Design a protein with these regions (language model features):
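C-terminal subdomain of the subtilisin-like protease fold in secreted/lumenal serine endopeptidases
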Residues: 279, 290, 444-520, 538, ...
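Catalytic-core environment of secreted peptidases
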Residues: 234-248, 381-433
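Subtilisin-like serine protease catalytic core
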Residues: 214-297, 307-310, 321-324, 336-342, ...
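Substrate-binding/access-modulating region of protease and related hydrolase catalytic domains
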Residues: 143-148, 177, 226-227, 272-277, ...
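Autoinhibitory N-terminal propeptides
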Residues: 18-224, 228-230
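Pro/Thr/Ser/Gly-rich low-complexity, intrinsically disordered linker/stalk tracts
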Residues: 710-736, 782-801
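Beta-strand-rich modules
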Residues: 764-784
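Hydrolase catalytic cores
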Residues: 268, 407-474, 600
Length: 825
């Protein structure tokens, strides 16, 4: 251990009882200190960084915060109750004269730990042999680089290098006894255990977003895979080569490759899963127009017509809380002028940053610029359990508007990288393409149910927000927006035409009728309009201000409104019913609404650029439970663990999972889940069968897979046994319970079924010079193919063939007729 860490286990000493401050690891009492708050110890001087936990007798006003900032301190964030985390550089800070601190402490090692790390009760996945894998959040990128350098050669800690969008985070495998010594480093702000292991597949995102639920694998199910929908994706230079992009790149306007970011994002949007089925994207039927960023934005006016681009994906930042810039104005203008278009952006990875919104670190740090627009979608980053990632940027927008709009899986997303490989990346860069792909499937759904017509981009955005699964505080909030995207609910809203479109001018009021059916558990009504672009120097972005209320029998309900005041308490508070004068979206929800007629009143309160077109979308959430993965027809592996997903109305009764292998004649217990859960792990039965079913039960409610699952192992060790000039032999290991094997070969876009054989070998007649890919799946006892193995590429080099030279017969002069032996025994 280098000198910098010596002696850092000693915590600051307290001299009297003082104020309580709450951290993840526990509650700490701060007291008055004898020494000056600006006094740096030797370690802080060497690190050129010092953190202070400072308590006051009240929440500071902006002016009072400014006094501490003038004294050289950065207010990193608020700590309950009435305390702040301050950061300074030794020798450049002093104590502010007013307001004076009631008490203070150095940020101790224990204060920096999660509760699990503090208690030493870490999950198994954190343990790597005799070490724990943890993530250190440093003060800035420079501090992170120095921290890595100081760990070089350490016997108790080793840096784990992975590709990440978070340069301030250092991943380390550390001996548990040394954890607190490292945490006490003056530049370390926070330490957490490594993330829970993700399923090694983009299928996690498909299940989270419910795109799997509208791309069913059973006869008669939905098949909205984005076919024919064009996505404009701008990123870090050329992508590929990758077999998952086969037949999917409509046009490529990129420069030379600069890395794997673009490959990964493209695969998340529409990868075919040709090599590894687990890497299938959200819209595998869609087409891609690819650019070096920001070509997908600068060229959209031309390519909206030339290539029929309908959705764009941009996982790039454009400043932090940059305000309503010229870029923002252009994005809003794009959507207004190209009515069938929608821009999708990552919200950003600055969740802990202070981007000068005015509430300190952790708020108002959307990384744009362009993603501050009113008419676009900015996406937050969730993990596989629907928890917001610490790095995910928060709202509000610069003027207090709701940001982000929605959230999606962005943590440990498995997708394509160059040279036919895959990797797991984390960031809103990954949540954004999951949402863009989901939108492509919804455009497909609209075309399929509306005689081939495209929906307005604003309508799709409204449907996505109103059908999202509410997370965080009830109603919209500045972390999750309107919640996690739910493609199944959105597709049903499209199929059932649960929307109305109208327009009005200044001072006009429209009255729209709505009948709520019986047994509705929740009613959601959302009004949205594509607002004209504002002047770039305008103090408030909203131009046309519509107001909306829901009315029944003289009683009325106003939309949910957030408080954008620049303090932590306001920004953390749940939405309240009020008049909204900031946003171009307003939503009313009612729990357990009475059945019968309601009226939707939309008023053009201030419409300087009218008339204004608007969309009303509505959702009747029944009292129900519904499996969303698996839905039927999926392949599972005996003895494996599957992450099961379902949707359900709110309730207090827990869920029970059951499985059957006899057509539902009897059911076996598979596990339970709490009432608030919407996912659970299932240990798949070990006996192979083509007739496995799953159901979920809550009280008298239940739902089961719409068709049997295919429970059989994936063939292993697929290889090219030999390759001759005119044929290639494939072989693989046998699979227990398999009645046959289906062999797949790469087609124009996807892996197509070639033939089915009984033995674990196949000789394919084809020229050796023809490059292609093969895969194989085991067939169950009732003739249903299970999951494909990872595909292998057949090259063009002869191997294992008795023929020593690559020669061909041009003509036969003698004998005129007869039989010729094969070149293989």
């Amino acid at each position: 251990m280098k000198k910098l860490f010596a002696g850092l286990l000693v915590l600051s000493s307290f001299v009297s009882v003082g104020q309580r401050v709450h951290f993840q690891s526990g509650t700490y009492v701060l007291t008055t200190q004898k020494e000056s708050i600006a006094t740096a110890d030797a370690d802080e001087k060497e690190a050129q960084n010092m953190y202070r936990v400072v308590a006051f007798d009240r929440v500071l006003t902006d002016a009072e915060k400014g006094a501490w900032q003038k004294a050289g301190w950065e207010l990193v964030g608020y700590l309950p109750d009435r305390a702040y985390l301050l950061r300074g550089i030794p020798g450049r800070v002093k104590a502010a004269a007013e307001p004076q601190a009631v008490a203070w402490s150095r940020l101790s090692a224990e204060m920096k730990l999660t509760q699990l790390l503090s208690n030493g009760n870490v999950p198994d996945y954190v343990e790597v042999r005799d070490r724990w894998e943890v993530l250190f959040l440093l003060a800035d990128t420079r501090s992170a680089l120095r921290f890595e350098q100081q760990l070089s050669g350490s016997s108790v800690a080793q840096v784990v290098r992975i590709e990440t969008d978070e340069p301030q985070v250092v991943r380390v495998q550390v001996i548990p006894q040394a954890l607190r010594a490292l945490a006490a480093h003056p530049a370390v702000q926070f330490v957490q255990q490594k993330e829970a292991p993700a399923e090694p597949e983009n299928n996690v995102g498909r299940k989270n977003h419910r795109t799997n639920a509208i791309q069913n694998e059973y006869t008669g199910g939905r098949a909205y895979d984005g076919t024919g929908v064009v996505v404009g994706h701008g990123d870090d230079g050329d992508i590929g080569p990758h077999v998952d992009f086969t037949g999917r790149i409509l046009a490529n306007y990129s420069n030379a490759s600069q890395g794997n970011h673009g490959d990964h994002v493209a695969g998340t949007i529409l990868g075919g899963g040709n090599k590894d089925p687990r890497g299938r994207g959200n819209a595998p039927g869609a087409d891609l127009v690819y650019y070096s960023y920001p070509g997908n934005l600068t060229q959209v006016d031309n390519h909206y017509g030339l290539h029929a681009v309908r959705v764009t994906n941009s996982s790039y930042s454009d400043g932090c809380n940059a305000g309503y810039t010229m870029n923002t104005r252009t994005m809003d203008q794009d959507i207004r002028q190209n009515k069938k278009l929608m821009h999708v952006f990552s919200a950003g990875n600055n969740g802990t940053a202070n981007c000068n919104y005015g509430a300190g670190a952790g708020w108002g740090n959307i990384t744009g610029g362009h993603k501050q627009g009113k008419n676009i979608i900015a996406v937050a980053n969730l993990d596989g359990n629907d928890a917001i990632a610490a790095s995910s940027s928060r709202g509000p927008a610069h003027d207090g508007r709701i940001k982000p709009e929605v959230a999606a899986l962005g943590t440990n997303v498995f997708s394509t990288i160059e040279n036919h490989s895959y990797a797991s990346f984390t960031g809103t860069s990954m949540a954004c393409p999951g949402t863009a792909g989901t939108l492509a499937t919804l455009y497909h759904a609209y075309r399929s149910t509306h005689i081939g017509q495209d929906p307005d981009g604003g309508l799709v955005k409204a449907i996505v927000m109103n059908t999202a699964d509410d997370l965080g505080n009830a109603g919209p909030d500045f972390l999750y927006g309107y919640g996690r995207v739910n493609a199944l609910r959105a597709a049903r809203a499209i199929e059932q035409n649960r929307f109305m479109i109208d327009s009005l001018g200044a001072g006009q009021t429209d009255t729209l009728n709505l009948t709520v059916p019986a047994n509705t558990k929740e009613l959601r009504v959302l009004v949205y309009w594509t607002d004209p672009e504002a002047l770039a120097n305008a103090g408030r972005a909203l131009v046309n201000n519509l107001n909306f209320r829901l009315v029944r029998d003289g009683q009325f309900w106003l939309p949910w409104v957030l408080n954008p005041n620049k303090n932590v308490a306001s920004l953390n508070a749940a939405a309240v019913r009020a008049v909204d004068s900031l946003n171009n979206v307003e939503q009313v929800t009612l729990a357990d609404p009475l059945a019968g007629p309601y009226k939707i009143l939309v008023n053009g309160f201030n419409v300087p650029q009218g008339p204004q077109k608007y969309y009303v979308v509505y959702e009747f959430v029944p009292d129900y439970v519904e499996l969303t993965y698996p839905m039927g027809g999926e392949a599972v592996v005996p003895g494996s663990n599957e992450s099961i997903r379902w949707d359900a109305s709110a309730g207090t009764t827990p869920f029970t999972l059951e499985w059957s292998s006899n057509g539902g004649a009897s059911w076996s217990f598979a596990g339970t889940a709490p009432a608030a859960a919407r996912s659970a792990n299932w240990s798949v039965p070990t006996t192979p069968t083509g007739d496995l079913r799953l159901r979920i039960v809550r009280g008298t409610q239940s739902d089961e897979t719409n068709a049997p699952l295919k429970n059989i192992a994936v063939p292993a060790a697929l290889t090219v046994a030999w390759m001759c000039p005119d044929s290639t032999k494939l072989s693989w290991n046998t699979v227990p319970g398999a009645s046959a094997y289906t062999v797949y070969r790469l087609g124009a876009r996807d892996m197509d079924s070639l033939t089915t054989v009984v033995a674990p070998t196949l000789t394919v007649v084809m020229p050796a010079v023809q490059n292609t890919w093969f895969a194989v799946a085991a067939v169950t006892n009732n003739g249903r193919a299970g999951g494909r193995c990872i595909a292998i590429e057949k090259g063009t080099t002869l191997s294992g063939c008795i023929v020593e030279k690559d020669a061909s017969v041009q003509s036969i002069t003698a004998p005129i007729a007869g039989q010729f032996p094969s070149c293989q025994p």
